[in-house]
Amino acid sequence: LVVATTASNNEIIHSLEALGLKVYLAGRPKNYEQMRVKVLKLGEAVGEKAKGEELVKQMDERIAKLESKLCKIPDDKRKTVVAFNFISAMGRKGDLIDNMLNMAHINNGVAQIPNEFMTSYVSKEQVVRINPDIFLLPTWNYDNRQDIEGYLNRVQNDPAYKDVKAIKNNQIKFVSDKYRYVASHYIVDAVENFAKAVYPEYFRGEKS
């Protein structure tokens, strides 16, 4: 069995099937509930339905435990963040990262922006209007050409952002890109890591 995503190249899928291989196309979840369904269906596809159900049970238990901690954050104390990739701010309303930030009791600033042209690009002017408490910068040097430190310096010293709260208060944080683009049961770890980055005071004394 070859597990691929619905974003996989169709020609490659057809080639694998022509070789007699069974291909299972896993979905691309955009929220926690869809991720639960993906895990359950994948468990069935590999003949491990019970293990899939157990894994989802563990996910739900961990999320409930996390929620019991984060629900103590008053609505008026929720932080607003803007997450960046190496091109612009990211995380439109309805994207997976938007759902994960909401689960972590974090206001996703980009989700507040009307997306009239259905584009993922977010301008600097829009980021300034959001005026977030925190910037979340990327960490994945996926092609060995991304300068993480250089990008940090450019953001910190960009005149457009000089009056943004995240810059004025030196609130620039990093959450690994493996959590931004999570595609499995590790979504729970992603939500937890976003929460720890933004609300470290709620996790003091815990092992990292």
Residue spans of the language-model regions?
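Acidic/His-rich segments in extracytoplasmic proteins that coordinate ligands and/or metal ions
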Residues: L1-A45, V122-A160, K196
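Extracytoplasmic substrate-binding proteins
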Residues: E11-N85, A89, V110-A111, I167-S208
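Short, conserved clusters of charged catalytic residues that mark active-site
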Residues: E61, K65, T119-V122, Q156
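Short gly/pro-enriched beta-turn/loop segments at secondary-structure junctions
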Residues: D75-K79, G94-L96, M103, I130
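Histidine- and/or cysteine-centered catalytic micro-motif in compact active-site loops
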Residues: F86-I87, I113-N115, P132, W140-N141
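Short, solvent-exposed loop/turn elements at domain surfaces
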Residues: A89-K93, N99, L137, N144-R145, ...
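His/Asp/Glu-enriched short active-site or ligand-binding loop at hydrolase and phosphoryl-transfer sites
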Residues: L96-T119, F174
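Short glycine/proline-rich, acidic loop/turn segments that cap or connect secondary-structure elements
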Residues: V155-K173
